[in-house]
């Protein structure tokens, strides 16, 4: 409850880094009031108390933030001057400090590798390209993104970044992309723990709403991914349609790649939501996830309508004509579960019967729209997502097809 006539209490629920004011804690004042230059007590973990002074104060009104001299209970404010502030801390009255119930932050469940972009198109669009730029940006993010973890690897241009899910990490990637960074990211992997000699993996509670027509398709796919159905009920709408509401307990790795797959199989009618539940013992049997094969560009150049037309019967295309490609770039999904090197830069040459430009009109299937969410769900262990300010590209880790064949034979 909001109490005006009481000592100051404010629970910090978010952090923001201001270039001029430093780190600012954001939260709603539960009781009392706060003013600029006021001395307060910061109540942290395990009863820690640190005195501090409010150097700057801003009040939120909708999406706008305005500097103020003071704020009262019920207002959402941003407080500067407390360098040690963290999510879950209480900003309290200096003379009568009483902590509010602390919020807990979920541990990371998914990790992926962020590395310097080393593709043939590297450096064309971005402003920040080097490992130093990447390292500074990732470690700066730790100041406000408290559930993120960044670890250095044995390679100076590669970092292991862990977060609370694919969405958490994709938001960071999109922010960096808009800021002008170029980077490459790997396939997301779940983080497993070992407790008492047992391997523990993260599980989530998954809620799905889907038209009754597609319930069999959804249930079959979730069964392959070790989903355990907890609840199912039929929902009748006012317009005469029926939908199934399904609740599942499922491993986090069973959710990876699930959204786009179900959207395709249900013609875009499925709605799903998932939240972290707990770490539980990992089952020995593996997920029955169907592997995918990719169409991989065989040479550098610009794609042509003729080559796309001849290739599209092999599977779903990710690019259209007139797109620059490089050898080893993934340009589509093969209809078979194996990679296929294709030449999408091939020109139609003239013959002694007709000129190269005179032929029937080519009907090209529109390419699949490339989004960051789709890219992260699609890529396999031997593929990367190339992220630049203007483009998202999929590529093989090893661009040379001979190197890929050698690696496959050696089992790497």
Which stretches of residues belong to each language-model region?
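Structural and coupling elements of P-loop NTPases
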Residues: 1-412
């Amino acid at each position: 409850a909001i109490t005006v006539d009481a000592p100051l209490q404010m629970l910090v629920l978010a952090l923001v880094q201001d270039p001029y004011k430093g780190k600012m804690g954001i939260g709603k004042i539960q009781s009392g009031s706060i003013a600029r230059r006021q001395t307060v007590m910061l109540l942290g973990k395990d009863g820690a108390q640190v005195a501090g002074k409010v150097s700057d104060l801003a009040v939120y009104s909708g999406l706008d933030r305005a500097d103020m001299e003071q704020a009262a209970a019920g207002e959402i404010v941003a407080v500067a001057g407390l360098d040690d502030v963290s999510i879950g801390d209480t900003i309290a009255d200096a003379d009568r400090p009483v902590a509010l119930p602390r919020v807990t932050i979920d541990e990371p469940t998914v990790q992926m590798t962020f590395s310097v972009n080393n593709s043939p198109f590297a450096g064309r669009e971005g402003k920040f390209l080097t490992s130093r730029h990447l390292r500074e940006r990732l470690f700066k993010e730790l100041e406000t993104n408290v559930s993120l973890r960044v670890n250095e690897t044995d390679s100076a241009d590669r970092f292991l970044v862990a977060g609370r899910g694919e969405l958490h990490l994709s938001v960071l990637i999109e922010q960096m992309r808009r800021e002008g960074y170029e980077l490459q990211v790997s396939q997301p992997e779940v983080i497993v723990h070992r407790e008492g000699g047992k391997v523990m993996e993260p599980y989530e509670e998954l809620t799905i709403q889907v038209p009754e027509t597609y319930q069999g398709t959804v249930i079959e796919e979730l069964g392959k991914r070790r989903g355990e159905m907890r609840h199912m009920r039929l929902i009748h709408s006012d317009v005469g349609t029926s939908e199934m509401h399904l609740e599942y307990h499922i491993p986090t790795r069973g959710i990876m790649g699930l959204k786009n797959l179900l959207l395709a199989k249900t013609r875009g009618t499925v709605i799903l939501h998932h939240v972290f539940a707990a770490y539980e013992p990992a089952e020995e049997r593996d997920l029955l996830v169907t592997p995918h094969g990719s169409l991989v560009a065989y040479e550098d150049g610009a794609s042509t309508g003729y080559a796309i037309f001849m290739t599209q019967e092999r599977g779903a295309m990710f690019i259209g004509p007139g797109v620059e490609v490089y050898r080893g770039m993934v340009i589509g999904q093969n209809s078979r579960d194996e990679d296929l090197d294709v030449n999408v830069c091939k020109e139609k040459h003239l013959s002694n019967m007709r000129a190269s430009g005179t032929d029937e009109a080519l009907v090209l299937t529109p390419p699949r729209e490339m989004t960051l969410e789709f890219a992260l769900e699609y890529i396999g262990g031997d593929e990367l997502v190339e992220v630049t300010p203007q483009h998202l590209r999929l590529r093989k880790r090893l661009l040379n097809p001979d190197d890929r064949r050698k690696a496959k034979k050696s089992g790497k």
